[in-house]
Amino acid sequence: MFRLIKKIKDNGRWRIFKLKLIDARLYFVSIFVGLLTGLVAVPYHYLLQFFFNLRHDFFDSHPKWYWYIPLFLLMWGILVFVSWLVKKMPLITGGGIPQTRGVINGRVDYKHPFLELVAKFVGGILALSTGLSLGREGPSVQIGSYVGYLVSKWGRVLSGERKQLLYAGAGAGLAAAFAAPLASSLLVIESIERFDAPKTAITTLLAGVVAGGVASWIFPINPYFHIDAIVPGMTFWGQVKLFLLLAAVVSVFGKFFSVTTLQMKRIYPAIKHPEYVKMLYLLFIAFLISMAEFNLTGGGEQFLLSQAMHPDTHILWIVGMMLLHFVFSTFSFSSGLPGGSFIPTLVTGGLLGQIVGLIMVQQGVIAYENISYIMLICMSAFLVAVIRTPLTAIVLITEITGHLEVFYPSIVVGGLTYYFTEMLQIKPFNVILYDDMIHSPAFKEEPRYTLSVEVMSGSYLDGKIVDELRLPERCVIINVHRDRKNWPPKGQKLMPGDQVQIEMDSQDIEKLYEPLVSMANIY
């Protein structure tokens, strides 16, 4: 028996077996991260819905005018408090996807992860409870990344495993927000990791399925399932013309949406008023919209759902509501308060599709019952135009609605939209936010940065001698971590499971991160 074990150890099978055990442990911990993320992100969603209903009941009761004053003052105080939280903890600002990518890349670090998690949770709920047009998905992604980070700290895992748990938590956060585990895994790959590694796909899927299961248990009724998607009876060339039209309209408005929102986000800090005065302006707009069309507040998701189920509305009214929602979302997002842009983007795309559908009904091309079909395709395509994550956009709409009828049209329109947005030179929204974050005055950059990559079996680095590797200029391998020990790099032959630490200039992180990580991975 002992001779057999010694023989296994000598021919390397023992090491492979240990690596498989380490992977199994990582997958098990990913499931745990998904469960914890679901237990945090789902209550986040529940409380957002609770406060939305509370506000709805208040405004729907049409109280005497003097009852609005204490509510207005209370919400003003809430926004001032949340803006103070953001000032104290800058990483909780906005949606959270760029911040999550920054932590994974090593640009920033969660210095006080538990406090920041609580601040993001509380700040996001309070900001959206006032009616601002913000989304829940970005904060859910960052909440999940905080959970993954904390579990990695408590579990004392390696730096490579920590990144996988961050990926798992981020994916689980989106899965908890939409009950869409497959789309959540794709979002991590397309928007955060930005290339496909098998281990990342597995960890995010495992965590996403668990978190999505928790979300489905708490929210068993998915309102998107009630949207009908009736395919219009059109010829092949009629469908081609329709898809080209939708892609062109979505691409042009996507360009306008991205440019306007980002310009407003840069103009907002330059407004020479105290922060509490800016919050007063923002709340005043939210109050007016709450009294005029309540469902447009809180991101506008309820308004989108009502229009998708009953799309036969006057076209001029929908145009006005879409423009109002767009302006309100732009102001809300530019404030920097905790809240994402994912749902406002979906709503804008859906309403744009409704406008196109109503025009086509007037021209006798389609019937009213086909408008929801157009809306779902435009929701997917608008995500492609703004965020540039085609796989996520296509799968998400199919997954949350359950309509396979829109899957193939979304692929065609999404592909055309991607091509048109490249022609229009629209940079991905989250990439611009990430660049703004790392170049902001508040960002402190260390001169050198250490990247840790795990060597996968069959990758380019597998079997290579460290001294023979030709790395980019000013990149140097400083350490090889193997079997829980640190080994000097000189003369080391790299093996699967090795954690290779590469030091580089901080200014080169974005340029070299993906090439260096891809050298250690297989596809």
Regions found by a protein language model. Give the residues of each.
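Cytosolic Rossmann-like ligand/nucleotide-binding regulatory domains
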Residues: 457, 462-508, 512
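Short, compositionally biased
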Residues: 512-523
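Short, solvent-exposed beta-strand edge segments and adjacent coil->beta transition regions
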Residues: 448-452, 497-499
